[in-house]
Amino acid sequence: MRSTSLLMQAKAAIPDIKQLPTKHKVSLAYTIHWPHKTVNPNINIKPREPVIFLHGVFGSKKNYRDYCQTIANQNYTPVYSLDFRNHGESEHAFPLVNYSTLTQDVVDFIHEHKLEKVDIVGYSLGAKVALLTLLKHPELCRSGVIIGNAPIKTPQVKVYLKAFIKALKALGDKRPEIKSNDKAWRAKARDVMRKYIPDGDILHYLLRNIDIRKPKNITEYKPGTINFSMPISHFDNKVVEDIADWPEEEVEGLKFEGPVRVIRGTQSVFINDKGLAAYQKHFPNYTLTNFNSNHLIWAERPLQVTKVVSDFLKKTRLLEMDGSAKALEESPKESYSRPPAHQQPLHKNDFTHIDVGALPVNGAQAESTQA
């Protein structure tokens, strides 16, 4: 309690850090991707069950617009793509990324929009929120597609989350030097962050949180310079711990009996043997699709991943939900002449070329390789 009080006092003493409200309910920003009309105007197609799409940490709904539209078109169904609290265009508030809070935000969204039996698709951070929604509110969900994460604690990701936050905060410190009317503002921002995140794909992903315009619901706006769509000044070790966490006690004994497709990058350690065992325990009707990819599956295999998602939704919608979920054909396992994913150091696979040594936390690298 004392450390929390001291942290709040320190933040209050810094003029650029705005205090955030504590809200247990936040109305999430969203985009509905409606299926494009059929070329035959005489055919009236009624949209089927809605799909909810949940993005990853430091992401937003705008990152996945094309994929969501493709899924909507191919399944003749609306896709609701959401922004989590403190991401994209959604409101900034405490708690920042607590899984129980994020899940309740999604459940409130489903109720507010009077959606029934949704198919829920989640990637990375969104994958864990999707899993928790399926387990705690099975009456609201028909199926799930889980990409790049598992229902377990993932301490191995902490070192990389710290690197991402450190890079974004370093850019925040340089804001007065980067003017919004400078045509090279994005290149200058990239140069600041490259010291911590040399990988081009990750840099591009993180830079999607920065704009020269005033984003919606922003709490730390400065005219004339770059601005963040996230309250990055408040992202600290508590955020890192929350993202790596999983509420094991909260889901003990819970199962989701509907169909679930898990999409795994075989070069990633996010879904290891322990993760697969947890899937079997909580999601007895899950099936697995492997990709020769790291954790950034959407960046490496965008068309293939989108096809797997669409094909799964089509197939499950043809099945009678009377126990026939097991009729789903499990994708063939791909074999690679490499050690099992959980025995590999994360920095050689999931987030290439991140300078782990530049991080300020002692022992973080050992933690990542031992998990």
Swiss-Prot record:
Family as reported in the entry's similarity comment: Belongs to the AB hydrolase superfamily.
Molecular functions (GO terms): carboxylic ester hydrolase activity; transferase activity
CC annotations in GO: mitochondrion
Biased composition regions of type Basic and acidic residues, renumbered to the chain: 327-336
Role this protein plays: Probable alcohol acetyltransferase that uses acetyl-CoA to synthesize acetate esters from various alcohols. Not involved in the synthesis of ethyl acetate.
PANTHER family found in the cross-reference section: PROTEIN ABHD11
Gene: EAT2
Entry protein name: Probable alcohol acetyltransferase
Disordered, as annotated region: 325-352
Keyword annotations of the record: Hydrolase, Transferase
Active site: S124, H295
EC number: 2.3.1.-
